Amino acid sequence: MDHKPLLQERPPAYNLEAGQGDYACGPHGYGAIPTAPPPPPYPYLVTGIPTSHPRVYNIHSRAVTRYPANSIVVVGGCPVCRVGVLEYCFTCLGIFLAIVLFPFGFLCCFALRKRRCPNCGAVFT
């Protein structure tokens, strides 16, 4: 059974002009972006006589500071030799207080730490 669609069942044509069909806007121009007004006419200049002063351009220069590209800052690096990385070490007094005042002595032990460079041996408090 070949069933051909009737004329009423076919979809509408795609070549509808503006203002036709189901999705047409209301009155013409409603919702459209208004066009810009034409630019004002330019005044006529008389040739041969300069009408304006010559233009002067000001050029400002800025001082640019350049930093060396090979300076690498290591966090925790030794400020004396700039090679070693500082390590924490506990003082003898801090270890003694940690043993004698057992639970609370650890606070004293961590409060009395020093930073030491393994490369040059410098000690920082």
UniProtKB/Swiss-Prot annotation:
GO annotation, cellular component aspect: lysosomal membrane; perinuclear region of cytoplasm
GO MF: identical protein binding
One of the Pfam families matching this protein, by short name: BRI3
Subcellular localization, as worded in the UniProt entry: Lysosome membrane; Cytoplasm, Perinuclear region
Assigned keywords, A-Z: Cytoplasm, Lysosome, Membrane, Transmembrane, Transmembrane helix
Topology in membrane: Multi-pass membrane protein
Keyword Transmembrane: yes
Membrane-spanning segments: 71-91, 92-112
InterPro entries: BRI3
Family: Belongs to the BRI3 family.
Subunit structure, interactors included: Interacts with BRI3BP. Interacts with MGAT1 and IFITM3.
Function: Participates in tumor necrosis factor-alpha (TNF)-induced cell death. May be a target of Wnt/beta-catenin signaling in the liver.
Name of the protein in question: Membrane protein BRI3
Source organism (scientific name): Rattus norvegicus (Rat)
